[in-house]
A protein has these predicted regions:
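Helix-to-loop junctions at the C-terminal end of transmembrane segments
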Residues: 56-70, 154, 252-265, 351-352
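Symmetry-related core transmembrane helices of the 12-TM Major Facilitator Superfamily/SLC fold
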Residues: 160-177, 358-377
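Structural signature of the two symmetry-related core transmembrane helices
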Residues: 73-87, 268-283, 364
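Juxtamembrane intracellular "pre-TM" segments in multi-pass secondary transporters
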Residues: 1-4, 179-210
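Cytoplasmic helix-loop-helix junction between adjacent transmembrane helices
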Residues: 104-138
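Hydrophobic core of transmembrane alpha-helices in multi-pass small-molecule transporters
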Residues: 15, 85, 95-114, 209, ...
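Central cavity-lining transmembrane alpha-helices of secondary-active solute carriers
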Residues: 45-63, 241-256
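Helix-loop boundary and gating motifs at the non-cytosolic
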Residues: 3-51, 201-230, 238-240, 308
């Protein structure tokens, strides 16, 4: 009975919130760019500010969950706040200072679900017949599915994206209530640093910074460039469809080629990943046809498929077993925090000076340099 009762809620607990990540990650830049006062620099500032607030809020919320008797209630609170703060962006006539205030409030609870859901699912999955990894895969599926769903939903007004995120947040509240709470302390902060910051790990963080610096710029400014009239002038619906196709490709790479990827050396995987990034940004820079430029999503799928199948196994090889959580956390701060902040902020400034199109040429050059360095920065196996 428990198997039948929990399988569907745990699946949906991943699928729905990661759908929110699809919406905000891809279309927050489109919304900001639609505001009358916004420039490319404004888009970069908003995404960079969101990255900083996300880093801070994750620490605060997980510590709060540690001290709470019921992690499910903490997740519910964060989702209710997320739904409420989504409504702020529906207000007419907001100014730039007000936008930044709304962004701070929104990102203070955005992405909070990720560590909390990982913990709640881990506490409950053993009551089903499925593995933890099986449930975790529905995060990628949810991201892709919602991206596909957006193609048939009204999207002419960028404010609609926040209506959708609010609806999904409320839906996630109901799903959370279907999952039993367990008072098990599974979110732990590993404070032991000895052995983490060895040469191999430091060099990997340097490579991570360079790769994410470039990928964050592409993720932030390509949707703006593709949908803007002064850019490619493409459809938001087509862009959303290709986000889904790319994510399904990413998922497929991890499933179909899992055994092959396990046998490949890390430096080869990161080198191929870098090459795919070069093709991705190079196509965006060189191609102006609104359909041919979508070939860049093929290389985006390869990029992320290799990334998510390579990072954790490689970290396990270069840091002590008792430091894995701390090492993974530091990697996340560099990738999702520092590199994303630096990339989006710098990208906005550069785009204001030389234009969006030339921005992707610069990314290609940086990626050529980073890809070459990957041969040196990734430890021999």
């Amino acid at each position: 009975m428990m198997q039948k009762n929990l399988t569907f809620p745990l699946m949906m607990l991943y699928l729905v919130p990661w759908g929110i990540q699809c919406i905000i990650g891809n279309f927050m830049p489109v919304y900001v760019a639609s505001l009358p006062f916004a420039t490319e620099k404004t888009v970069g500032e908003v995404v960079a500010l969101g990255a900083v607030i996300t880093m801070i809020s994750q620490v605060v919320w997980t510590k709060f969950a540690d001290k709470s008797k019921n992690k499910n209630n903490v997740l519910v609170l964060s989702l209710i706040l997320l739904a409420a703060f989504s409504g702020l962006f529906l207000i007419e006539g907001i100014t730039k200072p007000i936008l930044f205030i709304f962004v701070i409030l929104f990102y203070s609870c955005y992405m909070t679900h990720q560590p909390l859901i990982e913990t709640i699912a881990y506490e409950n999955y053993s009551a089903t017949k499925h593995s933890f990894a099986w449930f975790r895969s529905f995060a990628s599926f949810g991201y892709a599915f919602i991206g596909l769903l957006i193609t048939v939903l009204p999207k002419d007004n960028p404010k609609n994206f926040f209506i959708y995120s609010g609806i999904l947040a409320i839906l996630a509240v109901g799903i959370t209530k279907m999952v039993p709470s367990k008072n098990i302390e599974t979110i732990k902060t590993v404070t032991e640093k000895k052995g983490i910051y060895n040469k191999a790990y430091i060099l990997f963080l340097v490579l991570t910074f360079m790769f994410y610096f470039c990928s964050s710029i592409t993720a932030t400014f390509f949707p703006v460039y593709y949908t803007a009239k002064e850019g490619i002038g493409g459809s938001v619906g087509i862009y959303s469809l290709m986000v889904s196709v790319s994510t399904f490709l990413e998922w497929g790479i991890m499933i179909v080629f899992s055994k092959t990827l396990e046998k490949m050396k890390a430096k080869h995987k990161f080198f191929i990943m870098g090459i795919s990034g070069i093709f991705r940004s190079g196509i965006i820079f060189l191609v102006e046809n609104q359909y041919l430029i979508l070939l860049s999503f093929l290389f985006q799928g390869i990029w992320y498929g290799l990334l998510w199948s390579s990072v954790t196994p490689y970290i396990k090889k270069i840091v002590p077993e008792n430091c894995l959580a701390s090492a993974q956390g530091a990697w996340t701060v560099v990738s999702a925090g520092l590199a994303t902040f630096a990339g989006t902020y710098a990208g906005g400034i550069i785009a204001d000076v030389i234009g969006l199109k030339m921005l992707f040429m610069i990314i290609s050059v940086v990626l050529i340099f980073a890809t070459g360095l990957s041969i040196v920065l990734v430890k021999k196996e």
